[in-house]
Amino acid sequence: MRTGIIAQKVGMTSVFNNNGKRVPLTLVKVDDCQVVGHKIAEKHGYNALVIGIKDKKISRVTKPMKQVFANAKVSPKTKLKEFRISEDNFIDIAASLEVDHFTAGQFIDVTATTIGKGFAGSMKRHNFRGLEASHGVSISHRSHGSTGQRQDPGKVFKGKKMAGHMGCSQVTIQNLKIFAIDKEQGLIMIQGSIPGHKGSYISIKDAIKKISITA
């Protein structure tokens, strides 16, 4: 199991393939992605690489993190993330990771944070149908309805789908295919959509449920 990389979402576009079919693409940019540290099983209990992306002003870095970057001999990074790896897949500290870490046609898993929607009702958050539009229903048309049973159990069970905060949650989209790679621009073109807003940071790893790198 090898490391993944951190990228920044640029936006979406579309192209036509050789069969004339329109293919939606998400563009992500890999900028100054470097190995910042190692986590080893003997000391930390697991093997991992600490990856950082996008240079950051030294004045905006805390003193403890300044020492971390100084020990690694890399410029301060905006975003850091650990990636679990197998023992034979360590990469030297300060080594750069480019878009050619992946290949066109490869399947990947993308982890990102969804766009926050604030407090949302049950119809928007959980796709409930709501109550009737008439026939005696008053001011409860978008309500979720009953939330429990009776005196026994006398409570609302944990996990009950109700209105609440929607979005801002970490999700992983599996088995997305890399359409193409632009090494000069540092771009990876991924078929389909991925969570998050423009400019948000995402992590990309080899797909764990796809053995072949081509479709």
UniProtKB/Swiss-Prot annotation:
SUPFAM superfamilies: Translation proteins. GO terms for biological process: translation. Pfam families: Ribosomal_L3. It comes from the Bacteria. Disulfide bonds: none annotated. GO terms for cellular component: ribonucleoprotein complex; ribosome. The modification N5-methylglutamine is found at Q151. Keywords: Methylation, Ribonucleoprotein, Ribosomal protein, RNA-binding, rRNA-binding. Methylated by PrmB. GO terms for molecular function: rRNA binding; structural constituent of ribosome. Belongs to the universal ribosomal protein uL3 family. PANTHER family: 50S RIBOSOMAL PROTEIN L3 (PTHR11229), LARGE RIBOSOMAL SUBUNIT PROTEIN UL3C (PTHR11229:SF16). One of the primary rRNA binding proteins, it binds directly near the 3'-end of the 23S rRNA, where it nucleates assembly of the 50S subunit. Part of the 50S ribosomal subunit. Forms a cluster with proteins L14 and L19. This is Large ribosomal subunit protein uL3. It comes from Rickettsia bellii (strain OSU 85-389).
